[in-house]
């Protein structure tokens, strides 16, 4: 297939398990097409932000239609470029995905989680995410992994693996301007309901700082789960595309705790990138890609409860000019190292497209 410019490009077939409100599909597909201006024909399973059992059960007619549509799709992509993110269907062990990828004129498989280590979801015990991942790797012409760790895992099953990290669009973020801390310093955490549980790893540190400094924690999420002992210091804010940026800059620093497991080592540090894009100082667990992102952006790594207390205390006690300098460095670093503009050549190359002249 000869590379074509975006001006000559027929719509790319983009297949994903979630709609634009699903973080992975938004960051790995939708935002790329918005950035490049490439035309796309999107095929998301139900168009929802997740495919959990409750979501699927409430939409059985739409599920049947989605399954039929995906089975037809492989017969209509013979001269098309296809990019498939993660999986096409939660009711698959790779047969649907490999068929679509193998029938495409040029096929790309993209993943940003350790799907090979994810057996937590109820449906994955029947329809294996690992098997879907393996078969998709073998079927695709090019594989895009979201981190070096994920790429190393994929190398066993594909000889055409490249790394494109999760990226941010700088203009989508407000940048913090006021670095003064009032009577109650504020940490901020943003993420999906499924990852809220990771906050429990730093609950003792957060509670200690709540007692010492009256620390508050803003949780920007679609979730409503009980956060146990953290409930007294948490202020929940619903995640929306229209409002998340304004909520981020209200924080004094961002936090990204992660336990160290085979699955979490595949996380692609998107929370850290979002905090940095907002000009926030940041603290994170040096697990998986986090270690490299923290080092490149100048963030602070913390592992033990005592380290979390010490690092967050140090940020609270810094003067406003020092916090502003740290936040400015974060913003500059993320724009330079993790923006869509920085990685567009590699991403377009994976799709066999040359950049616009």
Q: What spans do the regions from the language model cover?
A:
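Conserved catalytic-core segment of nucleotide-activated headgroup transferases in glycan assembly
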Residues: 20-38, 42-49, 169-175, 180-250
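Membrane-proximal helix-turn-helix segments that form the acceptor-binding/catalytic region
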Residues: 67-79, 91-92, 96-109, 113-115, ...
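Conserved acidic donor-binding segment of nucleotide-sugar-dependent glycosyltransferases
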Residues: 295-306, 314-320
């Amino acid at each position: 297939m000869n590379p074509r410019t975006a001006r000559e490009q027929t719509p790319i077939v983009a297949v994903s398990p979630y709609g634009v409100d699903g973080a992975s599909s938004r960051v790995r597909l939708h935002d790329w097409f918005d950035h490049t201006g490439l035309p796309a024909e999107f095929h998301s399973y139900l168009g929802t932000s997740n495919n959990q059992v409750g979501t699927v059960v409430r939409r059985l007619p739409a599920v049947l239609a989605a399954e039929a549509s995906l089975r037809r799709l492989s017969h209509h992509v013979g001269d098309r470029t296809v990019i498939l993110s993660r999986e096409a269907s939660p009711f698959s062990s790779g047969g649907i995905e490999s068929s679509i990828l193998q029938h495409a004129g040029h096929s790309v498989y993209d993943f940003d989680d350790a799907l090979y280590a994810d057996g937590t979801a109820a449906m994955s015990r029947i329809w294996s995410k690992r098997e879907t991942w393996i078969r998709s790797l073998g079927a695709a012409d090019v594989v895009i992994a979201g981190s070096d760790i994920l790429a190393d895992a994929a190398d066993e099953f594909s000889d055409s693996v490249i790394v494109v990290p999760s990226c941010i669009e700088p203009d989508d973020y407000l940048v913090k301007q006021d670095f003064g801390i009032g009577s109650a310093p504020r940490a901020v955490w943003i993420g999906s309901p499924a990852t809220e549980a990771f906050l429990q790893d730093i609950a003792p540190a957060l509670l200690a700082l709540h007692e010492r400094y009256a620390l508050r924690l803003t949780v920007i999420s679609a979730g409503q789960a009980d956060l146990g002992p953290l409930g007294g210091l948490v202020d929940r804010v619903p995640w929306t595309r229209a409002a998340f940026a304004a909520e981020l800059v209200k924080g004094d620093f961002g936090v990204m705790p992660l336990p160290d497991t085979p699955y979490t080592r595949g996380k692609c540090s998107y929370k850290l990138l979002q905090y940095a894009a907002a000009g926030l100082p940041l603290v994170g667990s040096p697990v998986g890609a986090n270690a490299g992102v923290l080092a490149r952006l100048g963030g602070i790594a913390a592992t033990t409860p005592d380290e979390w207390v010490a690092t967050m205390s140090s940020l609270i006690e810094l003067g406003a000019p020092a916090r502003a300098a740290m936040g400015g460095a974060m913003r500059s670093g993320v724009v330079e190292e993790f923006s869509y503009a920085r990685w567009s050549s590699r991403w377009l190359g994976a799709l066999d497209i040359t950049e616009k002249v």
